[in-house]
């Protein structure tokens, strides 16, 4: 077998080419020409062929597609067609048992909805700047019926009423909150527990056990002791089911029904409350009635919160249900994020009536009373 020829490297070939080039200079004794300016070392990198550049697969900037009028119209029609709802019914799943048809229909509708959403997203990417704007989701709150009593912050009449109403001394810092908490006669342990939870949330509050004493008598005693607010917790079937808010000394008085009560110990994760004055957040009280209720709730808490405690008490109104939450916010590293730790309790209030002045069941003047069958004729009608 013939011996294999050794492959020469690029460096060796460049050296041979360099020696074979004609150079000018004197010839030495051995017959070799001497170059005048021969370099000591040969740089082979100069004679190497240039390396091929790698093709870039991922482009940093996406090229904008130039859409013709016909293509644009076709994509827009396709986008609108993808909004159509599915036409599948239970009759399409007759081959399944009756107990499984409902779940199968929901599963198919959900799958079809996801597919149409993905199709619309793809069309929006193709359209680019020509894509139509996303529609705002329709909710009961966004479709709320018009109410003539909606409060405008720049309304002079509202400002005049607030400057002369029963809560003006509190907002003018003429008085500081002092709250009395009591309950119905012969209250059970659960009601007492709820009163202690309220005392934990409301600073400067005191609990008084109530025996067979009339509520009017309690109001007069609270005035003599210079209390600014009175809370009376009612119970039904050994559980709290309502609460009376009475602002002293001139009222007004409101009655709320209590729903979805969860004590602190029943929460999955909770923290210990501190004695710092909390911040108060009042959300979504938009009408004149809602504005008065919000001012009544604000009067329960001191004016200047202590931000070092990071306590927050929230009254969030949604569809005339007032959700109560008690949190402490905690900052994460570098202060870029914050987390909420619930301190409890958790409950929901529903306004039943509002009475002018202090509580008077016989001769009291009611400003507003909830009559469900007469007033709740539409799901989109709210009063707070």
Swiss-Prot record:
Residues 18-48 have a biased composition (Acidic residues). It comes from Caenorhabditis elegans. Pfam families: Brix. It comes from the Eukaryota. InterPro entries: Brix (IPR007109), IMP4/RPF1 (IPR044281). Residues 115-127 have a biased composition (Basic and acidic residues). One of its GO terms (cellular component) is nucleolus. GO terms for biological process: maturation of 5.8S rRNA; maturation of LSU-rRNA. This is Brix domain-containing protein F44G4.1. GO terms for molecular function: rRNA primary transcript binding. Residues 96-114 have a biased composition (Basic residues). SMART domains: Brix. Residues 1-58, 82-135 are annotated as: Disordered.
């Amino acid at each position: 077998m013939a011996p294999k020829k050794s492959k020469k490297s690029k460096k060796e070939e460049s050296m041979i080419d360099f020696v074979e080039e004609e150079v000018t200079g004197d010839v030495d004794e051995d017959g070799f020409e001497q170059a005048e300016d021969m370099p000591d070392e040969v740089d082979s990198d100069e004679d190497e062929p240039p390396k091929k550049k790698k093709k870039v697969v991922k482009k940093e900037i996406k090229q904008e597609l130039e859409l013709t009028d016909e293509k644009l119209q076709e994509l827009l029609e396709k986008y609108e067609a993808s909004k159509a709802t599915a036409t599948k019914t239970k009759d399409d799943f007759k081959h399944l048992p009756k107990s499984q048809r409902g779940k199968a229909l929901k599963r198919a509708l959900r799958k079809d909805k996801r597919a149409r959403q993905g199709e619309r997203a793809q069309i929006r990417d193709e359209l680019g700047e020509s894509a139509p704007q996303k529609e705002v989701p329709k909710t009961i709150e966004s479709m709320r019926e018009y109410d003539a009593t909606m409060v405008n912050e720049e309304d002079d009449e509202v400002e005049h009423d607030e400057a002369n109403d029963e809560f003006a001394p509190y907002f003018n810092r003429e008085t500081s909150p002092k709250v009395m908490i009591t309950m119905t006669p012969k209250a059970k342990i659960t009601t007492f527990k709820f009163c202690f939870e309220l005392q934990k949330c409301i600073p400067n509050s005191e609990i008084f056990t109530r025996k067979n004493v009339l509520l009017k008598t309690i109001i007069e005693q609270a005035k003599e002791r210079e209390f600014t607010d009175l809370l009376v917790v009612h119970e039904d079937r050994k559980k709290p089911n309502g609460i009376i808010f009475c602002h002293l000394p001139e009222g007004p008085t409101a009655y709320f029904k209590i729903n979805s009560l969860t004590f602190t110990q029943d929460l999955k994760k909770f923290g210990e409350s501190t004695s710092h004055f909390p911040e108060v957040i009042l959300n979504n009280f938009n009408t004149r009635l809602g504005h008065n209720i919000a001012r009544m709730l604000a009067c329960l808490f001191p004016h200047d919160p202590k931000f070092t405690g990071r306590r927050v008490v929230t009254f969030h109104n949604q569809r005339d249900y007032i959700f109560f939450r008690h949190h402490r916010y905690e900052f994460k590293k570098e202060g870029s994020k914050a987390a909420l730790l619930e301190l409890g309790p958790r409950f929901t209030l529903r306004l039943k009536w509002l009475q002018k002045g202090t509580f008077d069941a016989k001769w009291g003047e009611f400003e507003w009373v909830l009559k469900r069958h007469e007033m709740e004729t539409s799901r989109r009608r709210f009063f707070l």
